[in-house]
């Protein structure tokens, strides 16, 4: 299966957040399915944001050695795309042209410049499709592989 999805930080965080059990289960299923089918990537930005959020903002933070093991597990499960100067420049353009925050624009730029057509995120912008990149909220109805699906069950 080819890589066609960039996972945003919130999908990873929900998998480790016990505050909303229904989203946690969905996020775990998404990660499991994407890892098994090798259809998703993350970026170095996503991995860094994940480490920050789960170590500081969860009810039960992940710290120290456990956090390092968790980051390693994610990096082994999903290819990690680096953020480079081209991505930063494209993010600046996206930020200005589409009124996105810089960090959201950088996620978009990473997907766009790596020819990844979908971003799984709960934070879908006003435009759900920007220059070849479709935003999909996997906790609602969404489309993957050109077919409409309900929820996360049919990601493969």
Where are these regions (language model features)?
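Alpha-helix C-capping/helix-to-loop hinge sites
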Residues: 15, 33-37, 53-57, 74-78, ...
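Active-site neighborhoods of divalent-metal-dependent phosphate/nucleic-acid chemistry enzymes
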Residues: 78-122, 152
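Helix-adjacent hinge/juxtasegments
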Residues: 58-81
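Short, structured helix-loop boundary elements
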Residues: 24, 64, 68, 84-85, ...
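Short beta-strand segments at enzyme active-site cores
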Residues: 41-44, 121
